[in-house]
Amino acid sequence: MPKYRSATTTHGRNMAGARALWRATGMTDADFGKPIIAVVNSFTQFVPGHVHLRDLGKLVAEQIEAAGGVAKEFNTIAVDDGIAMGHGGMLYSLPSRELIADSVEYMVNAHCADAMVCISNCDKITPGMLMASLRLNIPVIFVSGGPMEAGKTKLSDQIIKLDLVDAMIQGADPKVSDSQSDQVERSACPTCGSCSGMFTANSMNCLTEALGLSQPGNGSLLATHADRKQLFLNAGKRIVELTKRYYEQNDESALPRNIASKAAFENAMTLDIAMGGSTNTVLHLLAAAQEAEIDFTMSDIDKLSRKVPQLCKVAPSTQKYHMEDVHRAGGVIGILGELDRAGLLNRDVKNVLGLTLPQTLEQYDVMLTQDDAVKNMFRAGPAGIRTTQAFSQDCRWDSLDDDRANGCIRSLEHAYSKDGGLAVLYGNFAENGCIVKTAGVDDSILKFTGPAKVYESQDDAVEAILGGKVVAGDVVVIRYEGPKGGPGMQEMLYPTSFLKSMGLGKACALITDGRFSGGTSGLSIGHVSPEAASGGSIGLIEDGDLIAIDIPNRGIQLQVSDAELAARREAQEARGDKAWTPKNRERQVSFALCAYASLATSADKGAVRDKSKLGG
């Protein structure tokens, strides 16, 4: 029978000092012996996805204590990728994932907490907490802040839906008037919550559902809706049950590594491909799998991408649907239901509610359930009122979207495409693979060949795009922006958005060893591995080289002979200490980022730290 971890600090005469300090936090004699549960919050006023979380930790804590536990809350950092985008701040985004994971480990292990409720939401916070949860392997439930409502405005006498990416594209489009750009900017992000499309934050919150670590509805129920409060209340009650099951009944099925098994990871990736999730999810799932000591690799993702169709299409891949529409159609469980009926899921998995996949679908799939309360929950909709307050409205759709032929979520027979929304490509400068969000690629450019325009920083590429130096047919190559080379693996949302602003969205390709925002669409290929700074062949591409992209056949090829590439590699190596570094790039890199770069692996490994470099 496992011993409560917290007993280390609450029992025994020699722990009198620790108990004295616990008493100073409000604990009493009656609390010693109860499980101590960490409420891991991420409130900050910097991030709209987290601005409403200040009081939500208290909601969870009250339920924990009512159920017989002791709740202790702490906060992690949270970086807003949208605000950090397009300048030096983006260097810090991906490294913050490791800081978040480490800080959770530090706090939980330093104070011997028994379990956790993780209150996350945005891009690197959910992955960082997920990595920590699987590293620590103590009972955990995730409950995120929820998606933002889609923006809406009237343009050309038509009401259209908007999001952050629209504001970025129109702001850089010389054909758009100042007044229209201002109107879109003011309408794009109307409420608290994670940005309203299937961007990285919402993708990851959906994947925690598929992994079994959060409750049904977690990925899609709006941040502003009153129904979302119940997820927080339930999480506080349920975590005490899970904790007691493990420590008092020796039930290891309550542990995250047993819930988020390899079968669950395969289900999560299957969901990701079917819903056209952010390419960043590949990085984060690979990283989380390593923390769980699960053998889940790019090869597994490649195999899944070849058989899973696209059953859901959401912004940025279409302007018709946002997360509020996914929820109306049944949310994550709705997509999983269609995948299950197509025979594409592992059914022998459980979630934090203790339900198997078939049991979860029977109760929560809107196409199966007889529970009116569940149907009512999935009718929770937007109010269209600007607010930063959680649970501030109770609007509902008149009906569910259960149209699996033409609705937001489709059945296998009516799939958006037989190929899924993500694909892994391999070739002579991406030997370990690269990732493309096929959901956002127009059919006309699934095969594309063009001359390379090579840039050794995102900034130079942006200047060239806006300066008219990139023309139709070009393949923009941005290198030395990987985990080590950036350092920090910047997102390339501005270059891809500006290509659209310049009318080149369907006329050019962009390839990088960096990564893309979940808001990116178009022929944008990232995560090229090995990265240039690690000696990857992307560092050998020269202006004018022809690059052939073949998404249907999963290929990407630099049309240069092996002999020529060998000669270029020899010349690169001859640069000595300057080999595999960008030429003529001035970038101030802090000690903190240098420390990250010194251990960073390429994207095919999840951009995690290379433990072999630490010795031991």
Curated annotation (Swiss-Prot):
Gene3D superfamilies per record: IlvD/EDD C-terminal domain-like
Annotated protein name in UniProt: Dihydroxy-acid dehydratase
E.C. no: 4.2.1.9
Entries under InterPro entries matching the protein: Dihydro-acid_dehy_C, DihydroxyA_deHydtase, DiOHA_6PGluconate_deHydtase_CS, ILV_EDD_C, ILV_EDD_N, IlvD/EDD_N
Sites where the protein binds [2Fe-2S] cluster: C122, C195
Pathway per the UniProt entry: Amino-acid biosynthesis; L-isoleucine biosynthesis; L-isoleucine from 2-oxobutanoate: step 3/4; Amino-acid biosynthesis; L-valine biosynthesis; L-valine from pyruvate: step 3/4
Entry's transmembrane regions: none
Residue numbers bearing the N6-carboxylysine modification: K124
Active site: residue positions: S517
PANTHER family found in the cross-reference section: D-XYLONATE DEHYDRATASE, D-XYLONATE DEHYDRATASE YAGF-RELATED
Function as written in the Swiss-Prot or TrEMBL entry: Functions in the biosynthesis of branched-chain amino acids. Catalyzes the dehydration of (2R,3R)-2,3-dihydroxy-3-methylpentanoate (2,3-dihydroxy-3-methylvalerate) into 2-oxo-3-methylpentanoate (2-oxo-3-methylvalerate) and of (2R)-2,3-dihydroxy-3-methylbutanoate (2,3-dihydroxyisovalerate) into 2-oxo-3-methylbutanoate (2-oxoisovalerate), the penultimate precursor to L-isoleucine and L-valine, respectively.
Catalytic activity: (2R)-2,3-dihydroxy-3-methylbutanoate = 3-methyl-2-oxobutanoate + H2O; (2R,3R)-2,3-dihydroxy-3-methylpentanoate = (S)-3-methyl-2-oxopentanoate + H2O
CC per GO annotation: cytosol
Cofactor: [2Fe-2S] cluster; Mg(2+)
GO biological process, one term: isoleucine biosynthetic process
Family that this chain belongs to: Belongs to the IlvD/Edd family.
One MF annotation (Gene Ontology) recorded for this entry: 2 iron, 2 sulfur cluster binding
Organism: Shigella flexneri
Cofactor details (free text): Binds 1 [2Fe-2S] cluster per subunit. This cluster acts as a Lewis acid cofactor.
Binding residues for Mg(2+): D81, D123, K124, E491
UniProt KW keywords: 2Fe-2S, Amino-acid biosynthesis, Branched-chain amino acid biosynthesis, Iron, Iron-sulfur, Lyase, Magnesium, Metal-binding
